[in-house]
Amino acid sequence: MVDVFTVLIVVIQNVYNMKLKIKVKVLAKGCMPVLNDVGDWIDLKSAVDMEIPAPQSGTLKKTTINGERIGHRDVELPVYYIPLGVAMQLPQGFEAIIASRSSGSKKLGLFIPIGQGVVDNIYKGNDDQWHYICSPMRETTIEAGDKICQFRIQLSQKATMWQKIKWLLSSGIELVEVDDLGNDNRGMNITGIK
């Protein structure tokens, strides 16, 4: 008779030796993300060259507050969607967080106006290209292939107990390049605000 404890050990060892696979369809040459041993996040690259102008301030407005004349200008920060040249299928029960690189604000003058971007698990179609949604602090130039942001995966709030255990026991993640993700396109920003 097979010892249940032995079977359990074998199952745990097999799960532990498993890596969570992220399928990646490369849409622009040179944009395949690369796992490296330095740092916990995965760099993403711009798929295009872009000239981004500095934000423009409006006309000077003067207001009197408590008898004091105060001048101010409204500044509009435009939002840019920089294509990252990849579409990905995350493992079930996971989502991705996109954030600026630590040097991004200083070197590129870009920031994410909402702090970070979230890529849901359902955004996994062949044409569901990831984007870096950002605003400029100054005029800047981006070239295709520049590392402009980074991402990591984490459990989603809908992750099952099995997906949580798999994450806990996995030996990391693996990026697998594919020609076809085999999923319907979800589109970007399609859910609206109402």
PLM region spans:
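DUTPase catalytic domain/fold
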Residues: 5, 10-194
